[in-house]
Amino acid sequence: MATVPEPTSEMMSYYYSDNENDLFFEADGPRKMKCCFQDLNNSSLKDEGIQLHISHQLQNKSLRHFVSVVVALEKLKKISLPCSQPLQDDDLKNVFCCIFEEEPIVCEVYDDDAFVCDAPLQSLDCKFRDKNQKSLVLYNSYELRALHLNGSSVNQQAVFRMSFLQGDENSNKIPVALCIKEKNLYLSCVMKDGKPTLQLEMLDPRVYPKKKMEKRFVFNKTEVKKILEFESSQFPNWYISTSKAEAMPVFLGNTKGGQDITDFTMEFSS
């Protein structure tokens, strides 16, 4: 990256004239005169060639004017030019390396997995039923079951807190974490006996949920016409599933249709 020093008032007053086209300067001081340089050590007064013009007046000139002056002076110090040839833009290109100092550009590389968005974590409280209208109920503290509820038994239905996690905004799959509210029991996917298995884990409410959850807690939610599916992020193509039979455990399955139900409806809970 090229850097140019800021012009001081003394330099500005020394180098600039009132006429914008007078970007010519003499080497002998602040008197207004014109001088032609045939050689760095041998100058003579002529009416052609590169000329320097000095002015006492301080003007609010742009950086472009100042750079033009500096470039011209550096050119005169290092290179002699025939008076018969006017100074061209191409003549200044070779001088830039003498005036500008290159600085390295340091690019910091970030790990996408370590980056966490500053936006607050969003969540909602809800209840789920499978497409056969079976509700999800917490059974024996650490097991979810799906069964039909009637009358007062409806209160047994588990209330979930669904937290929306950081993920790919361009994907139609929304990463979420599912927690049984007031129990801090999170649905997670682990490998047991060589098979992906759904289980409940109790987590510290002071730490969880967080924007970047461990992969076993992440489910990719898809929704089509208010029908939801929850695919395990840890085990792709494995879904939260229920059996068509009554009061069976909720499990992780990789079969859509048949005896496995992977479609759910959701209702908000106050």
Swiss-Prot record:
Say yes or no: keyword Ribosomal protein present: no
* Keyword entries, A-Z: Cytokine, Cytoplasm, Inflammatory response, Lysosome, Mitogen, Pyrogen, Secreted
Q: What is the protein name stated in its UniProt record?
A: Interleukin-1 beta
Quote the InterPro entries the UniProt record gives.
Answer: IL-1_CS (IPR020877), IL-1_fam (IPR000975), IL-1_propep (IPR003502), IL1/FGF (IPR008996)
Q: What else is known?
A: IL1B production occurs in 2 steps, each being controlled by different stimuli. First, inflammatory signals, such as LPS, stimulate the synthesis and promote the accumulation of cytosolic stores of pro-IL1B (priming). Then additional signals are required for inflammasome assembly, leading to CASP1 activation, pro-IL1B processing and eventually secretion of the active cytokine. IL1B processing and secretion are temporarily associated.
Principal subcellular localization: cytoplasm
GO terms under biological process? cellular response to lipopolysaccharide; cytokine-mediated signaling pathway; fever generation; immune response; positive regulation of cell division; positive regulation of immature T cell proliferation in thymus; positive regulation of T-helper 1 cell cytokine production; positive regulation of type II interferon production
Q: What protein family does this chain belong to?
A: Belongs to the IL-1 family.
* Species of provenance: Pusa hispida (Ringed seal)
Q: What function does this protein fulfil? A: Potent pro-inflammatory cytokine. Initially discovered as the major endogenous pyrogen, induces prostaglandin synthesis, neutrophil influx and activation, T-cell activation and cytokine production, B-cell activation and antibody production, and fibroblast proliferation and collagen production. Promotes Th17 differentiation of T-cells. Synergizes with IL12/interleukin-12 to induce IFNG synthesis from T-helper 1 (Th1) cells. Plays a role in angiogenesis by inducing VEGF production synergistically with TNF and IL6.
**What SUPFAM superfamilies does UniProt report for this protein, alphabetically?**
Cytokine (SSF50353)
